[in-house]
A protein has these predicted regions:
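Short, small-residue-biased leader/transition segments that mark boundaries at the very start
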Residues: 1-5
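ATP-dependent carboxylate-amine ligase
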Residues: 8-139
Length: 139
């Protein structure tokens, strides 16, 4: 989507960070997964909660995790109470997965693990403030 292109940062060593941290729905998360899956390099997906889903929240987050099947995502990092459900259902579909209770912990693991040619996509509801993760990577 145009949003992805507009918020695409290229770092040294051909590392790409796509910031899509301003809004999220289960549908737009699936679209983001599709986008990331088309890129070459190691694909790292960072997802936070989709807020305001009401009583369907758990089931919808589980659905996003299930959607990762055969989407060629290498690494899944999640943050947030609801995103834990994405981790639970999605971890079997990726090479490596980890759920974080703190953004600082996630940033630490991510920055220490980042390699040349990695493709990182960050997405979550605005209230999750996942742009903090993006800013840590691109600063």
């Amino acid at each position: 989507s145009e949003k992805c292109i507009r918020d695409r940062h290229t770092l040294e060593n051909d590392i790409t960070v796509i910031n899509d941290a301003y809004n999220a729905s289960p549908t737009s998360m699936r679209a983001a997964i599709d986008t990331l899956g088309t890129l070459t390099g190691r694909r790292i997906l960072i997802l936070g909660d989709v807020l305001e889903l009401g009583e369907n929240s758990k089931e919808m987050h589980i659905g996003v995790g299930n959607y990762l099947e055969e989407k060629h995502i290498d690494v899944l990092y999640t943050f947030g109470n609801e995103a834990k459900y994405i981790y639970d259902s999605g971890q079997q579909h990726v090479e490596k997965a980890q759920h974080f209770n703190s953004k600082d912990d996630m940033i630490e693991v991510l920055t220490s693990d980042l390699k040349a040619h990695d493709r990182v996509l960050v997405k979550g509801s605005r209230g999750m403030k996942l742009e903090e993760v993006v800013n840590a990577l691109i600063s």
